[in-house]
Amino acid sequence: MRACTRRHALALAAAATVVLAAAAPAQARPAPESLPGLGADFHWGVAASGFQSEGHAPDSNWRRYVDTHPDYDRYGDSVDFYDRYASDIALARDLGVNTYRIGIEWARVQPRPGEWSAEGFAFYDKVIAAIRAAGMRPMITLDHWVYPGWEADRGGWANPGMVEDWLANMRAVVDRYAGADPMWVTINEPFAYLLNEVRNGGLPAAEVTTMQARLAQAHNSIYDYIHTRQPGAMVTSNVAYIPAADPIVNGGMLDLIAAKLDYVGIDYYYGLSPEVAAQYGAFADNRMWQLPLQADGIYYTLRHFADRFPGKPLYIVENGMPTQNGAPRADGYTRADDLRDTVYWLQRAKADGMNVIGYNYWSLTDNYEWGSYTPRFGLYTIDVEADPALTRRPTDAVDAYRAIAHDSGVPAGYRPTRPPTTCSLVDALDSCADPVGLPG
């Protein structure tokens, strides 16, 4: 791994703001007056993870982190997808999307070493069957930062036997579900996985490079196995794009797995402005609703990866907007406007030749955001701490996404509610040298 911490990456980003403040941007490339839709074969999806949404959590590293951390919200049963999967999948079906991302919790299907749970697998059998019956394709995440408590007792990713333990379980998952023709995400956001393990005490800081090497080994091995069980499979490991510092943050991991990616999985959420550069790390940790939204940043993010992986399919595996307990954002952005603006820039990217094949909204419902119920990302909002019924209440983005999925994009003459950022710090040098603008 290239030596890097969140502080290092964000310090570089802050430095970039100083340099670019004096930069003179090039003239924006011509913008088409209207844009075609993204096509009938485009993947419109919603996303969730097991631990964050299922509830009824078995013993795991994250169950332990939550139970022992004094500042984390109590988990309870989260939004109880475990008992409400059928109605939640129906909500996704009614949006008109065609892809549903879930996670298979290792701790649920293998509660003890060498022993798999028939009950655990039966739950996921029902979930995947319901997704397919609703006319959607599953996207299965094998590892979304959670592993069994017995594996934590062995040292987690510091354990030399971790990769073989991991592969034994993941092969069982692949054997069971390859016939459902899912898309696959092997490991969710490897860099964030590393950071969370260190800050929660699951990994000594000295073992970060070891964990990254083991994550890469695990990805590369299960990639090959998936292709033996599901010829033509689409497999990735999604990366969380870090504005202005992505080559440093994610470059090392991508170098290790680049040969075994059928599509590039990308998570994009925030822009980066000079006003918040110095506080970016603190906001990202516990006040993410204060981070700036920058819908046009998704265009520069896609262009960054299109240049890094020429011709490779690009899929936005996660994108969304946080609020603080559902309150209006200080910047006035609504969930519907942010979604429509983002999709406009997806269409611009496709029109400019980028091989964009899919987009997942994070998330279908609010969920447990790794220690807190305060950040709300859901198309459907849920007041976990005040509403025992866990009522799913639609936000304004539900109707917006339904129209987008139906039309495969925003209308041809749509104009974003916010102009593109001059010399965007999302991809600083490129956005100054080759910026994009709006028609007129």
PLM segments and residue spans:
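Active-site region of glycoside hydrolase catalytic domains
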Residues: 31-67, 113, 122-330, 337-439
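Glycine-rich, proline-tolerant flexible connector loops at the mouths of alpha/beta enzymes
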Residues: 106-116
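Acidic/polar N-terminal loop/beta-strand segments that form early-domain functional surfaces
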Residues: 47-49, 103-107
